[in-house]
UniProtKB/Swiss-Prot annotation:
Ca(2+) 1 binds at D37, D39, S41, T43, E48. GO terms for molecular function: calcium ion binding. Residues 24-59, 60-95, 97-132, 133-168 form the EF-hand domain. The keyword Transcription regulation does not apply. It comes from Oryza sativa subsp. japonica. Keywords: Calcium, Metal-binding, Repeat. Potential calcium sensor. Ca(2+) 4 binds at D146, N148, D150, E152, E157. One of its GO terms (cellular component) is nucleus. Residues 1-26 are annotated as: Disordered. Ca(2+) 2 binds at D73, D75, S77, S79, E84. GO terms for biological process: microtubule cytoskeleton organization. This is Probable calcium-binding protein CML13.
Length: 169
């Protein structure tokens, strides 16, 4: 942390990426912005944004596109500049990456690949991680996450649980 004019700010570790994006990903975002700013206005409107989002791998409805613009359009112009676009894309990429990570984690824990995490799955992964939970503690974990009462944790229940604990997106 450092202090500038009485304000405290967190220092980014040397070599850390701003916004958590790699230089390559930032370049892709800049290229997408430039490519889809077809009128060279320095801004992207809803139509241009829809094309840019598709190029970056996001399928979105017109309503979602309009909401995205409304969320970041500070001046109410109906379009977004590069800084707003980069900020928005950083958030979208973070959401996608988090979901991908949670999907991988679920797959690792769901050893028998039946689409559900059982008490046996939790016991096995806990043992692999060197955690010693009692059977009762494992049952409580399952019950806490098990919304539909089937005694196991499906993917949606897993996501919900991870969001509540701060590990998810």
């Amino acid at each position: 942390m450092s202090t500038v004019k009485g304000q405290t700010r967190r220092e980014r570790p040397r070599g850390a990426r701003p916004h958590g994006l790699t230089k390559q990903k930032r370049q892709e975002i800049k290229e997408a912005f430039d490519l889809f700013d077809t009128d060279n206005s320095g801004t992207i409107d809803a139509k241009e944004l829809n094309v840019a989002m598709r190029a970056l791998g996001f399928e979105m409805t017109e309503e979602q596109i309009n909401q995205m613009i409304a969320d970041v359009d500070k001046d109410g112009s109906g379009s977004i500049d590069y800084e707003e676009f980069e900020h928005m894309m950083t958030a979208k990429i973070g959401e996608r990456d988090s979901k991908e990570e949670l999907t991988k984690a679920f797959s690792i824990i769901d050893q028998d690949k039946n689409g559900k995490i059982s008490d046996v799955d939790i016991q096995r992964i806990a043992k692999e991680l060197g955690e010693n939970f009692t059977y009762q503690e494992i049952q409580e974990m399952v019950q806490e996450a098990d919304r539909n009462g089937d005694g196991e944790i499906d993917f949606d229940e897993f996501i919900r649980m991870m969001r509540r604990t701060g590990y998810g997106y």
